[in-house]
Amino acid sequence: MRTIDLDKKYLWHPFTQMKGWLENEQTVITAAKGIKLIDEEGREYYDGVSSLWVNIHGHQHPHIDKAIIAQLGKVAHSTALGLANVPASK
């Protein structure tokens, strides 16, 4: 089964009109580098919204990736609801 078929069968996309999503062919992103997203056909798109603001320095930034990999060896996520954590405090 194609990725988009699995997506349409099992995923809900918030802030998306699902009727239109399900009726039309959609772009599937398979990779990203710097400020560009890459689809299944190898076409490149500018990530104009920085993947909703979480990638303002681009995808696969070496300094950021190194810090993420180091942090994953400690704790992947902890809530800020009543707890503090070292990386956020720095």
Walk through the language-model features, giving the residues of each.
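Glycine-rich loop-to-alpha-helix module at the N-terminal edge of alpha/beta enzyme cores
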Residues: 44-90
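Active-site-adjacent loop/helix segments that line or gate small-molecule/cofactor pockets in enzymes
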Residues: 1-31, 50, 75
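Active-site and channel-lining beta-strand-loop segments
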Residues: 26-48
